[in-house]
UniProtKB/Swiss-Prot annotation:
This is A-type ATP synthase subunit E. Disulfide bonds: none annotated. Signal peptide: none annotated. The keyword Cell membrane applies. Pfam families: vATP-synt_E (PF01991). It is a peripheral membrane protein. It is found in: Cell membrane. Gene3D superfamilies: ATP synthase, E subunit, C-terminal (3.30.2320.30). GO terms for cellular component: plasma membrane; proton-transporting two-sector ATPase complex, catalytic domain. Has multiple subunits with at least A(3), B(3), C, D, E, F, H, I and proteolipid K(x). One of its GO terms (biological process) is proton motive force-driven plasma membrane ATP synthesis. The keyword RNA-binding does not apply. Belongs to the V-ATPase E subunit family.
Amino acid sequence: MDFEQLLDKSLNKVREEIKTELSKSLDEAIKLLNEGHNKIVQEYSQRINELIVKTKEEIEGEKARLEVENKRTLLVEKEYWINKVYERVLGKIGEVVKTKEYKDAIENIISKEIKEIREEKVTIYCSPNDKLMIEKIVGNNKNVTVKTDEKMLGGIKIYFERSGLTRDFSLKLILDQVFDSMRGKISDMLFGGK
C-alpha cells in the first residue's frame, strides 16, 4: 500500500468516526432539545391548568357573590312591596271605622270589659274621631274615663288603674298581628308560591 492509499484509508476511517460522532451528537442534541421542549410544554401546561382552576374558582366565587346579592335585592324588593300592601291596608282603616260592624265591635268590647271591672277605675283611650261614640256607649258610668290618643287610628285601649294592666284593642295592633301572621300568604299572592 502506498502512502496515498494509506492516507485515504486513514482519512476514511477518521471521516467515519467523525460521522458516527456527529450522528451521536446530533441524536443527543435532538434528544436534549425534545426533553427541553417537553419540559417547557409540561411547565406551561401546568401553569395554564393552574390559571384555569384559579379563574374557575374566581368565577364561581363571583357567581356565588352575585347570587347572594341578587337574593338580597329580591328580598329588599319583596319587602318593599309587602310594606306597600301594609300601607294601603293601613290607609283603609279610615273606611273601616265608619262601618256599623266597627261600632258594634267596639260596643261589644266595652260592654264585656265594663262588666268585668265592677268597682275598678278604668281609662279608655281612643282616637279623637271615636270619642263621642265611646262616651255614648259608656254612658254615665263613673268608673270609666274616656281620653283621646292622637296616635290611635281606631279601636280602643283600656287601662285598669288598680292592676296597672292595659288591654289593647287598637286597630293598628290588630292589623299588625294579622298582617304578620299572613305575611307569607301575602308574599305568595304578590310573587307566586314558593
